[in-house]
Amino acid sequence: MTTVSLASQTRRKTGDDRVRYLIIIFFVLAFVPWRSVAMPDDDFAAHTVDAVSALHHWYNPNTGLWKHTGWWNSANCLQGVEATLALSHDQKDQAVIENTFNRNAANNFLNDYYDDEGWWAETWIRAYDLTGQARYLNAAKVIFQDMTNGWDSHCDGGLWWSKKRTYKNAIPNELFLLVAIRLHQRTAGDGGPGSYFYWATNEWHWFQASGMLNSQNLVNDGLTSDCLNNGDTTWTYNQGVILGALADLYKVTGETNYLARAEAIADASISTLIDQDGVLTEPCESNGCHGGDVPQFKGIFIRNLAYLYSVDRKPAYLDFISRSAHSVWENDRNNKNQLGLKWAGPFDSADPARQSSAVMALAALAELSKTTNVSLNPAEPQH
């Protein structure tokens, strides 16, 4: 796989180009109504656009990132913009995606954390799918190539969380698998050593043997220094990314064991990681989930559950997505269309992580309603 410089792709931008871009982005965010184009005929497409419009309150066009949140969170915020682009095909959304890319391409979207890199790779693959612009796919290839450097023989394989090599855990490995199989789907090549497919299958073989998948079909956070399951929290996002990756492995190979494992994890998640009303929750929500990471997690799960549903059409998943989206909009929203941490409500506070996470529930239902004969009123959860 050939590494290319993203900076070289953007060097031709002149100073006038950059000024023009800032003017366009400022105009888009400040003055243009975001619900201005034809969208699917359902409320949740409109709700998604309204919620993403609120998300842009924190967008900084000078940096191409969202204020008051982290680097990896901004990748997921951008996936919220991509969700509205998929629904509305509005060029205003595409302008934000382009601005974020142009403002940050010089460092190839690399940093000291392999999971952060994976989020950006996933985001640029999605941008490629929506726009057809090869530079986004090239960005994902560059990121993936760097991620391969995180694999070594400690614990018989797997990626480290960071380049300091102190912790092997679930999320960088799930993202590595997801990005590998999606690059395989979008590029020519065989499955030989060093190929994207090779990495995807190697990663999955290692992951399922690592012990991080526990006896309840849930993924714990990571491994001890002795390469054992550390028993840490079964965060929702660790259950989510693996669903999308396994769904794509099934699509590529036709091997039903991938789909069966994805469904086992999904079934365990939607029956366990919920409150008394069947709404997705994190274990820390009773004390506010301090920090900027956890508020991002639930949207990642829903995004990948929706992708799994698009493959297997299991009714329980659609009902769960519908219940989540309804609860977010009805119980976890203020009068500015800002969305909070607790999807069951009440609204607590607003920030880009909370907002972009909840956007994923709205967008998932809106997107599925385009292709599914779906009642937008969820069934009562079964206890």
Locate predicted features.
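N-terminal secretory signal peptides that target proteins for export/translocation
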Residues: 1-19
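Alpha-helical scaffold segments in carbohydrate-active enzymes
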Residues: 54, 83, 103, 126, ...
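Long alpha-helical scaffolds in large eukaryotic adaptor/regulatory proteins
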Residues: 88, 131, 180-183, 187-190, ...
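Cleavable N-terminal signal peptides of Sec/SRP-targeted secreted and luminal proteins
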Residues: 21-33
